[in-house]
Amino acid sequence: MRIIETHRDLLSRLLPGDTVGGLAVHEGQFHHVVIGSHRVVCFARTRAAADRLPGRADVLRALAGIDLGFRTPQPLSEGGAQGTDEPPYLVLSRIPGAPLEDDVLTSPEVAEAVARQYATLLSGLAAAGDEEKVRAALPEAPANEWQEFATGVRTELFPLMSDGGRERAERELAALDALPHLTSAVVHGDLGGENVLWETVDGVPRMSGVVDWDEVGIGDPAEDLAAIGASYGEELLGRVLALGGWADNGTAERISAIRGTFALQQALYAQRDGDEEELADGLSGYR
């Protein structure tokens, strides 16, 4: 809770009505997120992440004008401008709910309900990707996205790996060569379980909203499907694919290739941001 002690006075002002000592903190890859009863405060972990905060707020404002069928955080205020003694921060509205508990999907009824809501979410993102105003507001994945990623990994991360780690990474990068350039849907970019919030209604989870839109863009929906599989396993992913009409070999191959890069993605972003903790975690299987 060091982040709370460091910014106690500021948090008292930004989160009126909350007891600072009782606040929870979520440690994300790019931000420390302090969670109040009605608002959350995002503090950047690194200088690079701080420089991206204004752009993050702009993206959330753009999303607010799109009917996605679920709630997204609304920017309320920003701080830490150059020339002030405040740390860079972004205050957002809080989406009620929490990530799913690890054991909740053991119930077939619950697993089916969760899969249906994920299929609805992804169908909504795909439909939004067809809207001209949405495509104008969000960045489109570049045609050479994965080639640039592979170059970055080889240049910046290979020197930090063991021989066996480089061999593993080469296999994972080789799988990217066959990926087509698709820009058919709004892609969240980090749709892991911690970023999808749920409330329980009559004993069944109901999706309340989606947070952490730092990497949103127009791209391949297989990226979000890969994150669902990494969070919840192949059985739930299979249900989502069947419900959404995506259970074809091409989609499965794209999901597998993208999922194989998740640790490398974490490590490369951390290396560029100067975040040693996230870098060490991402490279733990390559050293």
From Swiss-Prot:
Active site: D190 (proton acceptor)
InterPro entries, A to Z: AGP_Transferase (IPR051678), Aminoglycoside_PTrfase (IPR002575), Kinase-like_dom_sf (IPR011009)
Record keywords: Antibiotic resistance, ATP-binding, Kinase, Nucleotide-binding, Transferase
Molecular function GO terms recorded: ATP binding; viomycin kinase activity
EC number: 2.7.1.103
Catalytic activity, reaction form: viomycin + ATP = O-phosphoviomycin + ADP + H(+)
Highest taxon, organism lineage: Bacteria
EC primary class: transferase
Pfam families: APH
Keyword Nucleotide-binding: yes
Biological process (GO), any one: response to antibiotic
NCBIfam families attached to this UniProt entry: viomycin_Vph (NF000088)
Family from the record: Belongs to the aminoglycoside phosphotransferase family.
Protein purpose: The aminoglycoside phosphotransferases achieve inactivation of their antibiotic substrates by phosphorylation.
Name this polypeptide is given: Viomycin phosphotransferase
Species of origin: Streptomyces vinaceus
